[in-house]
């Protein structure tokens, strides 16, 4: 990608830095200092430094060795990394080199202290990132907040409304569930443990697609109407393009609960969902646990893209 593409993906990249990675994750950035292929000139280095990505500049004569080394570095640190080339060199043949052997990637395991990017854990995650970049030992993990006592009181009324749905959802635990930052992310805490990774608004669906393609074929994404309309629907397009039979739980409560309660018109959500009518599994009474169980059971029985739309009544 070019630096402009990196800027568009910066929220996802930054969250990958804080979450860490299981396998190597290397971005190949085409820097365009003369603007021959870009609408503006943006230097890649300062952007990568701001995102705290390890990176190296390379060219046709050294890219083989440099790429091998940056992959190994990403794997060793458990962090994303980048290699920067000049866009003007894109058509220049590279010198072939023997790749350095990279040890097998460790297997993914659930690590909510590291992977739930929520305010209660962000200071620890910041300290872990600093230690990784400095090559020192990370601090010991803090205890996870427990639901509901460890949850801010102002969020509990909204979370209580979600409880019947998440009791049913947790009972059908999949091997991987991605969530968006928001109040529902609290259901990643014990005793529910219903969400494994929480990142930026709109990140749940792309993450779940990646998990599915990596072999977690029962993966779920949990998102809210505000996050879905803001960015998550782009992931739905990707699921269709890749023909991924993903399972999505969409919490439609009609407002941006976490950021101040801004209204989300149901007509706007319906307009976005109109193109996916065959994928919709309606859940019109998410306060009824039996209705939730029925909708989730129907979803897991389908071998196609499925979106459970849980429409909550006004509080």
Each PLM stretch: what is its role?
Residues 1-56, 61-75, 181-257, ...:
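Thiamine diphosphate
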Residues 2-3, 33-38, 56-60, 115, ...:
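Hydrophobic alpha-helical scaffolding
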Residues 13-17, 44-45, 71, 165-166, ...:
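Short amphipathic alpha-helical segments and helix-helix/interface helices
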Residues 40, 161-165, 200-207, 235, ...:
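Catalytic-loop motifs flanking and including active-site residues across diverse enzymes
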Residues 42-45, 97-101, 192-195, 236-237, ...:
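Short secondary-structure boundary/capping segments
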Residues 53-183, 283-315:
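Flexible, low-complexity linker and terminal segments
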Residues 99-110, 196-203, 263-275:
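Acidic, Ser/Thr-rich peripheral helices and adjacent loops at domain boundaries
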